[in-house]
Amino acid sequence: MQDLKQRPVSVFREFLDSEAAGGIILMVAAALALIVANSPLAETYFSVLHAYLGPLSVSHWVNDGLMAVFFLLVGLEIKREMLDGQLSTWPRRVLPGIAAAGGMLVPALVYVFINRNNSAALSGWAIPTATDIAFALGVLSLLGSRVPASLKVFLTALAIIDDLGAVIIIAIFYTSGLSLAYLGAAFAVIAALVVLNRMRVMTLLPYLVLGAILWVLVLKSGVHATLAGVALALTIPLERSAGVGHDLDHSPLHRLEHGLHKIVPFFVIPIFGFANAGVSLAGLSLGALIEPLTLGVAAGLVVGKLVGVFGSSALAIRLGLADLPAHTGWSHMIGISLLCGIGFTMSLFIGLLAFASDVALQDAVKVGILAGSFVAAILGAAVLLMAPAAGVAEEETE
């Protein structure tokens, strides 16, 4: 019984360790992309991205194909945490849920306010709403034991809810030109996946085969293909197979999630970062940095996330709706709110969807994301370094 109670903690530790290491690799991949895009290899770099492999360009294979695997992992994490983890009860969901809501609403409002006179840019309102869990945990990992474990749990839970919000935003606001025939076929495949789940089929292969078919149908339907990964994830059983005991570690969901944790942080996300972070800085001036689109993204990530996450958390705590994470104080919450402004992967992805046909606007978005995420990471790390070490109580929390 003791082992069963401790299992979610060990799984969560594994998740944190994997994502932190992946975040560091992602930083290297993004930096390398910037270097290559501003070197004599730039022409080759962009030519490879626009080269076609079959029906899609390399860039599309990365953004529609590999990112579907990323969204599959996101969906698996959301399902597991909601049913058997850090978000399995309402008290556990309250603070990260409220913080995530504030952390999505306020950055969007900041972006819209700055771009209120720039109608062409308004479709990018969702870009600064995202938090990159890989990058954020990568920064936290560099701070070591100074960061309370409860703060890492809070950040991860917040980011999972944030990812769920991003999935909903993409499905509602960044889907167009629907093909009802392909969409109907996709729903038929989803129904078949649900039937497999209800029949307690515990072998992963039929789910993965139908998932591949679902990806093709969703791609053809006009809905963004990455959402096929989320739909597949929600049908993967969390129950254990008969005769394996009571440990949910043997469930199909956990087995697939465990396998993807070896692929996504160290392969999928770095490739996405390398393929999308490359932007030419030639001719970049201070004026370009304060263009409404770029400034809106950067300010949304830094100011919007700080005000949104910290403000909503503080309000919830003061109203008695939630408690501070264990062994943390307000300075920790300020630091973690700033780190939520690291919005690399999902922000880039939404930016590509928002301005799919305008490379100039995509580049402006990338500069804003890189600048905002860099500032948020530096400020957040600095605040957490100055905060009391883990386990030291702060008078301000009393």
Curated annotation (Swiss-Prot):
It catalyses: Na(+)(in) + 2 H(+)(out) = Na(+)(out) + 2 H(+)(in). Keywords: Antiport, Cell inner membrane, Cell membrane, Ion transport, Membrane, Sodium, Sodium transport, Transmembrane, Transmembrane helix, Transport. It is a multi-pass membrane protein. The chain crosses the membrane at residues 21-41, 56-76, 94-114, 124-144, 153-173, 176-196, 201-221, 263-283, 284-304, 306-326, 333-353, 367-387. It is found in: Cell inner membrane. NCBIfam families: NhaA, PRK09560.1, PRK09561.1. This is Na(+)/H(+) antiporter NhaA. It comes from Mesorhizobium japonicum (strain LMG 29417 / CECT 9101 / MAFF 303099). The lineage of its organism: Bacteria, Pseudomonadati, Pseudomonadota, Alphaproteobacteria, Hyphomicrobiales. The gene is nhaA.
